[in-house]
């Protein structure tokens, strides 16, 4: 259930440090697979909840997945075809993530639904920026380690999907 999903997400968080520590070795590949498996497994209970709670849960999941794919392909395609360097976004994105983490922690205690939606909207924009930034770094040679490149893009896509799911569910979900 939800407890197992939370443990898997926590395990994925721990594995993200293992991935960084092993990124320069062949063990890093195994660490990436374990990390992705834990994060995906942790996502399972959330997806199940959407299917059970909302009568249109399958449509919400499909929309979130489709929009995630569209955003990723559009932004990565733009960075690939133009070759533009988006390194200038780095400081803004890092600061934005720190602000969002503080806001998320605050909302755990405050439990304000509108704040949750605002956070999701901001995280969607931030993850879009990270996709541009990370793809640009890969294309322009700023990120030469394919393991770290994989993790960076995976986390951007994962978080983009989660927050699109939250936003679409709140706006179109029917009980």
Please state what every model-predicted region is.
Residues 1-175:
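A hydrophobic alpha-helical transmembrane-helix feature that marks the membrane cores
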């Amino acid at each position: 259930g939800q407890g197992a999903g939370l443990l898997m997400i926590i395990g994925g968080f721990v594995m993200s440090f293992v991935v960084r520590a092993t990124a320069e070795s062949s063990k890093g590949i195994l660490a990436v697979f374990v990390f992705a498996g834990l994060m995906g497994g942790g996502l399972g209970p959330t997806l199940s909840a959407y299917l059970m709670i909302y009568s249109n849960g399958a449509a919400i999941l499909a929309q979130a997945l489709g929009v995630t794919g569209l955003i990723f392909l559009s932004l990565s395609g733009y960075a690939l075809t133009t070759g533009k360097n988006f390194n200038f976004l780095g400081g803004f994105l890092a600061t934005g993530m720190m602000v969002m983490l503080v806001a998320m922690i605050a909302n755990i205690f405050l439990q304000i639904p509108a704040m949750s939606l605002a956070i999701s909207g901001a995280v969607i924009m931030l993850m879009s920026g990270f996709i541009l930034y990370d793809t640009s770094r890969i294309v322009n040679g700023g990120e030469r380690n394919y393991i770290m490149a994989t993790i960076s893009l995976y986390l951007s896509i994962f978080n983009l999907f989660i927050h699109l799911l939250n936003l679409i569910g709140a706006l179109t979900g029917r009980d």
